[in-house]
Amino acid sequence: MAKSAQGRTKEPTPMMRQYLEVKERYPGYLLLFRVGDFYETFLDDAVTVSSALNIVLTRRSNGGAGEIPLAGFPHHASEGYIAKLVTKGFKVAVCDQVEDPALAKGIVKREITDIVTPGITYSDKILDDRHNNYLCAVAPVKRGREHMAGVAFVDVTTAEFRMTELPLGELKDFLQSLRPSEILISSRDKELRESLAKSLFSGALFTTLDEWMFTEEQAARVLENHFKTHSLKGFGIEGYEAGRIAAGVILQYLEEAKQGSLKYLVRIGLVESGETMTLDIQTCRNLEIISSMQDGSLNGSLLEVIDRTKNPMGARLLRRWLLHPLRKLEPVVRRHDAVGELLDAPEMREGIRGMLGGIIDLERALARIATSRAMPREVRQLGSSLAMIPQLKSLLEGSKSLRLRELALRLDPLPELAETIEKALDAEASGTLRDGGYIRAGYHAELDELRAISSGARDRLLEIQQQERQRTSISTLKVQYNKVFGYYIEVSRANSDKVPEYYEKKQTLVNAERYTIPALKEYEEKILTAEEKSQLLEHQLFQELCAMIAEQAASIQTTAAALAELDCLACFASCADEFGYCRPVMNEGTELSIRAGRHPVLERILGADEPYVANDCQVGSEQQLLIITGPNMAGKSSYLRQVGLVVLLAQVGCFVPAESAEIGLVDRIFTRVGASDNLTSGESTFLVEMNEAASILNNATERSLLLLDEIGRGTSTFDGMSIAWSMCEYIHDQLRSRTLFATHYHELAELESRFERIVNFNATVVETADTVIFLRKIVRGASDNSYGIEVAKMAGMPPEVIERAREILAGMERREVEVPVQRQALPLRVESRQISLFEEEESRLRKALSGIDINRLTPLDALMELKRLQEIALGKGA
């Protein structure tokens, strides 16, 4: 055999030939090869597995090919080891022995029995029951001049399967909110894959597939075959070619991944862009919706504060709701109606929440049952959960809320199925299939008969033992069993002379002899046959029960979805009760009025000795753009986030942290809050800021809410102020979006006198003799001081630095070219770059000023003229 890259120069053993043949079919996977009681990996896979799992790397003989690297682990511990590999981003193929080694002629037959990837896993050791685990496919297409992307995604553990199409430019934001664990993409789309890998969250595995899988014909064939239909018109997806391609890719990938029956994927839904709000990456991050900006964890996020769900299904739905707020008035109001009724009926609410806490995760239980991964205990828990549905249903049927009554109608207790599960499974039995005994006595006559034979035969063996002791006068004679020799009679060496002639020797030990007799052989056959038949029949009955449950997949999934929504609504009511939230008044106007609003996260973090300062917000047709000035640490950014979170909560269907709120529906929430370098992509703070600002200006509408903080601070004062000024003009005149614009450019306060819908607000402070106190109250009017030196003092700057800063600031405010120098230091010339607009300059500038026609200047022209005047003042111009 020719020498390979891995150093094999001679003929390998038959088992290694079998291994290499399987490995060749699954080149992108770590191949776990079952050998006896172990899963073993060889060659390069062994090196990888040894390093990833921190287990011993050894070597084994490979016949004439010499020794090869080997790493392995016991099969009974495989779930934990596989979980570690998948969590680290590897794909794993499991190759099992599919015949009894004792009966094998030659090499034991082996086949791939399971494939586990980040997007295809059912293991509790990998999954978080409060998060979805999505497998996603992306299929870009070009229609004329328009570049689109078809996206499909599935959570195999919950059967959620949906698709959409969107402009290619919106793909990153969509995937960021979806956060799939694995993304399938065509080999021809290398540039797109690299772009997504750079800009998306870390942790997603990109799996490249052959081009032929990404065709409309192939997708139609796969989808129609899966859903057993000749047309996809009934699913409402006929107009979405790229989305269908992506959906077809997912199904084919799952089928090739040995996922068993996928019949529980009974429907595919469409993500309607007009129904829910799209939150871009920046908004999700800046508002800290599901993770904090500080460390990316749940701590300090909105989700952490309001997640009072009682069931994993509700927790997953709440997460999806927060990332996709509603855009239509009717569904928002219906959720508010339901929350209001649950708030006003605490006994009903707590009764519902108590029952939800006792119901199993139906979605994931169903998926494991349908794919033959469930244990008997989980199936029994599903039956017990179905048995609770009638009581829950009765609590909802008299509701005033239309949405609660609709949810009640969707709850199907499936009484016959629940009764069958109760009759079939023994509540006291072991939870594993291997141990047996889980089918209840009386459920199946043949199984009861086999168990009786087995039990009776065991009694007969005890009789044989007693009879032979009497016949032989050997009181220590024992009838025993092992897997190699079966049942035998064991006699000590000291008593071997008492053994009758009809005893047939089976084995000689150091201190004993083992025999069999005709009567023992007869009953051994009865016992083993009955036990084997009993085990096979019990397993068959369990599989039939699982198939019966899988046939009801559509009904169980509908019930699960209703339970999840009910959990979220009850969660919102609980939050409103606990935190003092109010019901917002929603309408289709463009006004936003919040009275005594609070930041939902900060108010929970602050202690009793530092109560949260509530603030009003009025923005709309008369006050369209609020310019908010004031020092750092005064609460400007928190105020912006507070307003954004109040609006988001309202459109999710939750009550809001305020005394009152009236909110005209928002179609998008855009934020630009704080610096966020993207240095790994070669983008500076300012470039990132401008990219985000440009995206906002290009996508916002009159119905959008814009929350902009410190635009332009990443560049020079002159450039930054020019950009901030120009953006305000554009938003006011062109977009007319409701906007909160926090800035340290106090010169922007001039905009109020020039534009009818721009209004100044400021974050108030109180000055004392030697310090300032930040009140964190937003009030009408502009601020005239940034108090930057006071903030530096609070941060612990050395006193001499603070004192020197005050001297320099005083000189700048007097507009001196020569500023006061430090004592015992050389004179220092400071060039002030902080330009004030519309002031008279020195007499030497009068000639230049007199030639300017102010009435014909645009704001941008005025800034350019000011730049020229500055250069004259600094001796750079004429």
Curated annotation (Swiss-Prot):
It comes from the Bacteria. InterPro entries: DNA_mismatch_repair_MutS, DNA_mismatch_repair_MutS-lik_N, DNA_mismatch_repair_MutS/MSH, DNA_mismatch_repair_MutS_C, DNA_mismatch_repair_MutS_clamp, DNA_mismatch_repair_MutS_core, DNA_mismatch_repair_MutS_N, DNA_mismatch_repair_MutS_sf. ATP binds at residues 630-637. PROSITE patterns: DNA_MISMATCH_REPAIR_2. The keyword Transmembrane helix does not apply. NCBIfam families: mutS1 (TIGR01070), PRK05399.1 (NF003810). This is DNA mismatch repair protein MutS.
